[in-house]
Swiss-Prot record:
<keyword id="KW-0808">Transferase</keyword>
<dbReference type="InterPro" id="IPR044138">
    <property type="entry name" value="CysN_II"/>
</dbReference>
<comment type="function">
    <text>With CysD forms the ATP sulfurylase (ATPS) that catalyzes the adenylation of sulfate producing adenosine 5'-phosphosulfate (APS) and diphosphate, the first enzymatic step in sulfur assimilation pathway. APS synthesis involves the formation of a high-energy phosphoric-sulfuric acid anhydride bond driven by GTP hydrolysis by CysN coupled to ATP hydrolysis by CysD.</text>
</comment>
<comment type="subunit">
    <text>Heterodimer composed of CysD, the smaller subunit, and CysN.</text>
</comment>
<feature type="region of interest" description="G3">
    <location>
        <begin position="107"/>
        <end position="110"/>
    </location>
</feature>
<dbReference type="GO" id="GO:0005524">
    <property type="term" value="F:ATP binding"/>
</dbReference>
<keyword id="KW-0067">ATP-binding</keyword>
<feature type="region of interest" description="G5">
    <location>
        <begin position="200"/>
        <end position="202"/>
    </location>
</feature>
<dbReference type="GO" id="GO:0005525">
    <property type="term" value="F:GTP binding"/>
</dbReference>
<feature type="domain" description="tr-type G">
    <location>
        <begin position="19"/>
        <end position="238"/>
    </location>
</feature>
<feature type="binding site">
    <location>
        <begin position="28"/>
        <end position="35"/>
    </location>
    <ligand>
        <name>GTP</name>
    </ligand>
</feature>
<dbReference type="InterPro" id="IPR005225">
    <property type="entry name" value="Small_GTP-bd"/>
</dbReference>
<dbReference type="InterPro" id="IPR009000">
    <property type="entry name" value="Transl_B-barrel_sf"/>
</dbReference>
<comment type="similarity">
    <text>Belongs to the TRAFAC class translation factor GTPase superfamily. Classic translation factor GTPase family. CysN/NodQ subfamily.</text>
</comment>
<dbReference type="InterPro" id="IPR050100">
    <property type="entry name" value="TRAFAC_GTPase_members"/>
</dbReference>
<dbReference type="InterPro" id="IPR031157">
    <property type="entry name" value="G_TR_CS"/>
</dbReference>
<dbReference type="InterPro" id="IPR041757">
    <property type="entry name" value="CysN_GTP-bd"/>
</dbReference>
Length: 473
C-alpha cells in the first residue's frame, strides 16, 4: 500500500468516525410494506452487492410476490417462515451509511402477537417510521405501534403513507390520513415531532429520489429527512450519571471504578457524590484502556479513580455534588410483559437496573392498557404482550431516574427467578419515596433471604406466590 492509499484510507476512516449515528425502526400493519421500504433504501443507496443481488433474484422467483421483478422485502425477511408467509416475525436489523450519516434500521413485526418484539426494537431507537397503506388509512396496529413507540421514549415519528401509486397519487387521500393521525396524536405524548411523507416503496418514489408524480408534495424525500434530522437528546447533559459496573483492582496499588458515563460530564479534580451511601469524594484520575483523560463525555467507557478509599459496590452511582437524586425503594412503572406466564400481584422477580441485579416484588397492578384504544382497563393480571402500569417494591434502596427524563437509568428488565429468562421490560414512571426514607424491616429481609435459598435449591416446592404474597402484601 503506497503513501497516497494510506492517506486516503485514513481520511475515509476519519470521515466514518465523524458521522453521526441514527437508529430508527419501521412498524405498521401487516403487509404495509415495511420490509420493502428497507429493501428499497438499501438498494437505492447502493448497499446491496452484486452477489447479494444475484441470490436475491433467485429467492424472488421462489418466494417473491412481484412476479419477475426483484422482491426487495426479501432483503430483510431473513427467517424461512417469514419468506414463506410474506410477513416479518423477528426484529431484523440492518446497517447502512451514506455520505452524511450512519444508520441502524430495525424492521419490526406488525402482528399483535409480536408486540414484545416490536417493543424490543423500539427500546434502542431514536425515531420511528410508521407505515400506513394509503388504500386503508389508519389501522388499530398503527395506533398500537404509535403508542408503543412513544411509550419507549421515541419523540420523532415519520408517518410514511405508502402505496400512493395504488390511489393514483391523490393529495386528498394523503391529507385525510394526515388529519386523522394528528387528531389521534393528541392522545400521545405532548412533545412529539411528526412529519408526513407520501411514497411508494415498491416503485422507489420519495424514498431516495424525489418523484414527479406528486407535485403537490413540497417536502423532502425520506432519506433526505433521515440524513438531516437533529435528534435532541432527552438526557440532560448537566446531570452526571455514572453507574459503577465493575471494581477494577488489578493490583494492590490501583483501585478504580469502571462503567459507561450515561449522562453529564466528568473531569479530574471534580467533587462528586456517591449514592446510595451519600458520600462525597474527588476524582483523581480518569483512565481508559490505553490512556488517561482530563475529562470524559457522555457515552465513554472509563475507569474512575477517587482520592478517598471508599467501599463502593457494583450498581452504585456517581452524581453531581449538588444532585437531589436519592435512593428509593418503591416505584410505579409501565411494563411490557413478554412471557406466557401470567404476571400477578405478589410475585417476585429479579431485575437488571443500570447494571445492577436486584429483587423486586409486584405490590399492585394498577391497570392494563388497551393499546388499540389507549383506554385504561382494570386488571389483576398481565398476559403475554400486555402493557400495564404496576407498583413495585425493591428489596433494597436503588438509584434511578424517571424513564421520561433518562432512558438509560430509567429502564429495567424482569428476569424469572427459576429460569433466568427475560420476561418483561419496565420503564419507571416515578418514585414513591423521593427522599429515600426506607423503612427498616429485618424480619422481611430474613424472609427474603430464606426465600432465595428455597427457590434456588428446592424449586420443585413451588412456593414463590404463597411466600412472597405473605411477606410483601
Amino acid at each position: 500500500m503506497n503513501i497516497n492509499m494510506k492517506d486516503n484510507f485514513k481520511k475515509w476512516l476519519d470521515l466514518q468516525q465523524k458521522k453521526t449515528l441514527l437508529k430508527f425502526l419501521t412498524c405498521g400493519s401487516v403487509d404495509d410494506g415495511k420490509s420493502t421500504l428497507i429493501g428499497r433504501l438499501l438498494h437505492d443507496t447502493k448497499q446491496i452487492y452484486d452477489d447479494q443481488l444475484f441470490f436475491l433474484k433467485s429467492d424472488s422467483k421462489r418466494h417473491g410476490t412481484q412476479g419477475n421483478e426483484i422482491d426487495l422485502a426479501l432483503v430483510v425477511d431473513g427467517l424461512q417462515s417469514e419468506r414463506e408467509q410474506g410477513i416479518t416475525i423477528d426484529v431484523a436489523y440492518r446497517y447502512f451509511s451514506t455520505n452524511k450519516r450512519k444508520f441502524i434500521i430495525a424492521d419490526t413485526p406488525g402482528h399483535e402477537q409480536y408486540t414484545r418484539n416490536m417493543a424490543t426494537g423500539a427500546s434502542t431507537c431514536d425515531l420511528s417510521i410508521l407505515l400506513v397503506d394509503a388504500r386503508k388509512g389508519l389501522s388499530e396496529q398503527t395506533y398500537r405501534h404509535s403508542f408503543i413507540s412513544t411509550l419507549l421514549g421515541i419523540k420523532y415519528l415519520i408517518v410514511a403513507i405508502n402505496k400512493m401509486d395504488l390511489v393514483n397519487y391523490k393529495q386528498e387521500i394523503f391529507e385525510n390520513i394526515k388529519k386523522d393521525f394528528l387528531i389521534f396524536s393528541k392522545k400521545l405524548a405532548n412533545d412529539l415531532n411528526i412529519i408526513f411523507i407520501p411514497m411508494s416503496a415498491l416503485l422507489g418514489e420519495n424514498i431516495v429520489f424525489k418523484t414527479k408524480l406528486m407535485p403537490w408534495y413540497q417536502g423532502v424525500t425520506l432519506l433526505s429527512f433521515l440524513e438531516t434530522i437533529k435528534i435532541k437528546n432527552s438526557i440532560s447533559s448537566e446531570e452526571l450519571r455514572f453507574p459503577v459496573q465493575y471494581i477494577n483492582r488489578p493490583n494492590a496499588d490501583f483501585r478504580g471504578y469502571s462503567g459507561i458515563l450515561l449522562s453529564g460530564r466528568m473531569h479530574v479534580g471534580q467533587t462528586i457524590k456517591i449514592l446510595p451511601e451519600n458520600i462525597n469524594s474527588r476524582v483523581s484520575r480518569i483512565v481508559t484502556f490505553d490512556k488517561e483523560l482530563k475529562k470524559a463525555e457522555i457515552g465513554e467507557s472509563i475507569t474512575v479513580v477517587l482520592k478517598d478509599e471508599i467501599d463502593i459496590n457494583r450498581g452504585d452511582f456517581f452524581v453531581n455534588i449538588d444532585s437531589i437524586l436519592q435512593p428509593s425503594q418503591e416505584a410505579i412503572i409501565d411494563i411490557v410483559w413478554m412471557t406466557d406466564n401470567i404476571l400477578l400481584a405478589g410475585e417476585s422477580y429479579n431485575v437488571k437496573l443500570s447494571g445492577k441485579k436486584i429483587r423486586v416484588y409486584i405490590k399492585e397492578i394498577l391497570f392494563k392498557l388497551d393499546v388499540n384504544t389507549l383506554k385504561k382497563v382494570k386488571s389483576h393480571s398481565l398476559v403475554l404482550n400486555s402493557i400495564g402500569r404496576v407498583k413495585i417494591y425493591f428489596s433494597k434502596p436503588v438509584i434511578f431516574d424517571n424513564y421520561s427524563e433518562n432512558r438509560m437509568t430509567g429502564n429495567m428488565i424482569f428476569i424469572d427467578l427459576l429460569t433466568n429468562i427475560t420476561v418483561g421490560a419496565g420503564m419507571i414512571v416515578n418514585s414513591l419515596d423521593k427522599k429515600g426514607k426506607i423503612p427498616s424491616n429485618k424480619q422481611k429481609d430474613f424472609e427474603s433471604d430464606f426465600y432465595d435459598l428455597i427457590t434456588r435449591h428446592f424449586p420443585h416446592w413451588n412456593i414463590p406466590k404463597i411466600l412472597m404474597k405473605k411477606v410483601y402484601k
